[in-house]
């Protein structure tokens, strides 16, 4: 059963030259996400897509509870599809709400990235 849906759209240009903004990257992304971003040579579409996915997940959990961006990790599944791993407050919130799964989809063009997250009970 669907608990909630979140969506986010971001401009890719906001994430150009992000390699120079190391502090921002370290504040928003987990070490696993940063490793993937480095493998992709700091591709702004990749960074924008991951950022949009984190925002979409946060919106799908829209309860007013604030948590750190690093509490939401976007991973690549075996088939290459994005998967969500939660930590700390985000993980605890899902447990409290009875959320069993969060699915996420990411897409991007040259100028925008979009992500949709569905929280399921």
UniProtKB/Swiss-Prot annotation:
- Top-rank taxon: Bacteria
Q: Identify which cofactors the protein needs according to its UniProt entry.
A: Mg(2+)
Q: Where does Mg(2+) bind?
A: 8, 55
User: What is one cellular component GO term in this UniProt entry?
Assistant: cytoplasm
Q: Does the keyword Methyltransferase apply?
A: no
Q: Give GO BP annotations, semicolon-separated.
A: fatty acid biosynthetic process
Q: Which reaction does it catalyse?
A: apo-[ACP] + CoA = holo-[ACP] + adenosine 3',5'-bisphosphate + H(+)
Q: Which GO terms describe its molecular function?
A: holo-[acyl-carrier-protein] synthase activity; magnesium ion binding
Localization annotation = Cytoplasm
Q: Which UniProt keywords apply?
A: Cytoplasm, Fatty acid biosynthesis, Fatty acid metabolism, Lipid biosynthesis, Lipid metabolism, Magnesium, Metal-binding, Transferase
What InterPro entries does the entry give? 4-PPantetheinyl_Trfase_dom, 4-PPantetheinyl_Trfase_dom_sf, ACPS, Ppantetheine-prot_Trfase_dom
Record carries keyword Lipid metabolism: yes
Which top EC class applies here? Answer: transferase
Q: What is this protein's function per UniProt?
A: Transfers the 4'-phosphopantetheine moiety from coenzyme A to a Ser of acyl-carrier-protein.
The UniProt family comment states: Belongs to the P-Pant transferase superfamily. AcpS family.
Q: What is this protein called?
A: Holo-[acyl-carrier-protein] synthase
- What is the species listed in this Swiss-Prot or TrEMBL entry? Caldicellulosiruptor bescii (strain ATCC BAA-1888 / DSM 6725 / KCTC 15123 / Z-1320) (Anaerocellum thermophilum)
């Amino acid at each position: 059963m669907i608990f909630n849906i979140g969506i986010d759209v971001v401009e890719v240009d906001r994430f150009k030259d992000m390699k120079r903004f190391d502090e921002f990257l370290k504040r928003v992304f987990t070490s696993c996400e940063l490793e993937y971003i480095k493998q992709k040579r700091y591709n702004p579409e990749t960074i924008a897509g991951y950022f949009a996915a984190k925002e979409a997940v946060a919106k799908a959990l829209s309860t007013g509870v604030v948590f750190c961006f690093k509490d939401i990790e976007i991973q690549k599944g075996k088939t290459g599809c994005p998967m969500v791993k939660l930590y700390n407050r985000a993980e605890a919130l899902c447990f409290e709400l009875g959320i069993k799964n969060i699915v996420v989809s990411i897409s991007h063009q040259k100028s925008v990235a979009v992500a949709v997250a569905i929280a399921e009970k």
